[in-house]
A protein has these predicted regions:
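Short glycine/serine/threonine-rich phosphate/pyrophosphate-binding segments
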Residues: 2-5, 82-86, 137-140
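C-terminal substrate-binding/catalytic lobe of Rossmann-fold NAD(P)-dependent oxidoreductases
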Residues: 2-63, 152-155, 159-160, 165-283
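Structural alpha-helical scaffold elements that stabilize or flank donor/cofactor-binding regions
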Residues: 67-69
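An anion/phosphate-binding loop that grips the pyrophosphate of nucleotide cofactors and donors
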Residues: 72
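Rossmann-fold NAD(P)-binding glycine/threonine-rich loop
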Residues: 81-126
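Rossmann-like dinucleotide-binding core of oxidoreductases
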Residues: 110-182, 186
Length: 283
């Protein structure tokens, strides 16, 4: 819902006529969340067989999602079913619309990462795959420390230390460190593959490899990385790159709970919108 809230809060300045969100299941314990989004100016839709239940919860403005599909110019799918929804729903809609899916839906469309390849939005395509948070993080590190400075990157290695689940979730918590298998012999996990494909769209071929492990924490993903360059590089130069970056932030904090707490207290909807937060003393 932070994305819905952001778009609704700024719809006038963004030139949006309406912000419509789809809620599948009417749950009384989520009434407050829906009320908050409606107060911001967003409109709720659902399937025909659940609209009456939303009306019973007090959301008399709830309407049919099928009409929303017809009326909307841009459809953003934030579910792990984006590819299935394309096959079953979106492919039959007006193809002048723009369709976006989350990072898990590999193959949905061209990779897009904000601040990394904005120019892809100008291409004649109607399907975009929004890169995941880890893909944004890795791509921004590669772009900031290598590509933007025209340094020849020999190799990039990454270990994604992933949170078990989000603080908003009760399910899928991992009680112990759990390793993610290397499903790709060239890239390891999908994280390096996704970043490689993102830059390959621009004709750049990068030697990247990633591993991942899920840890019993709900705070934030953490990334370990090692970049090897052809030529020697000075620590001062790297720090200058970090401090001048628009999308990477620097911090003196050394624990994810401290960074998470700062974002909760000062971030938009309690979120940090930077691609990554780099602990200065770790470089």
């Amino acid at each position: 819902e932070p994305l819905i809230g952001l778009l609704a809060d700024h719809k006038d300045s963004l030139g949006l006529d309406n912000v419509i969100f789809f809620k599948r299941t009417p749950l009384s314990d989520e009434r407050g969340k829906v009320e908050s989004l409606i107060r911001k100016g967003a409109k709720i839709v659902s399937t025909t067989d659940t609209i009456s239940e939303f009306h019973q919860l007090g959301f008399n403005e709830a309407s049919d999602v099928e009409q929303a599909y017809a009326d909307s110019d841009v459809i953003i799918d934030c579910t792990p079913s984006g590819n299935d929804n394309w096959d079953n729903v979106y492919s039959s809609l007006d193809q002048n619309k723009r369709f976006m899916a989350q990072g898990s839906e590999h193959g949905f469309g061209s990779f897009f990462a904000w601040g990394i390849n904005n120019e892809i939005l100008q291409e004649d395509s109607n399907k975009f795959l929004i890169a995941s948070c880890n893909t944004h993080n890795i791509a921004s590190i590669v772009k900031t420390f290598a590509l933007d400075e025209e340094r020849e990157l020999v190799e990039g290695k990454f270990v994604c230390l992933r949170r078990a689940n989000d603080v908003s979730q009760n399910d899928s918590f991992s009680p112990s460190p759990t390793i993610t298998k290397h499903s790709n012999q060239e890239f390891g996990t999908h994280h390096a593959r996704d970043v490689h494909e993102l830059f390959a769209q621009e004709g750049k071929k990068l030697n990247l490899f990633s591993s991942a492990i899920k840890l019993p924490t709900q705070y934030m993903h953490t990334l370990w990385f090692s970049l090897t360059f052809k030529d020697a590089i000075q620590h001062e130069a790297i720090m200058n790159n970090l401090n001048n970056s628009e999308f990477l932030m620097a911090t003196e904090k050394m624990s994810s709970n401290k960074v998470f707490s700062f974002g909760r207290d000062h971030g938009y909807h309690g979120r940090l919108l930077s691609h990554g937060v780099v602990a200065e003393q770790s470089l």
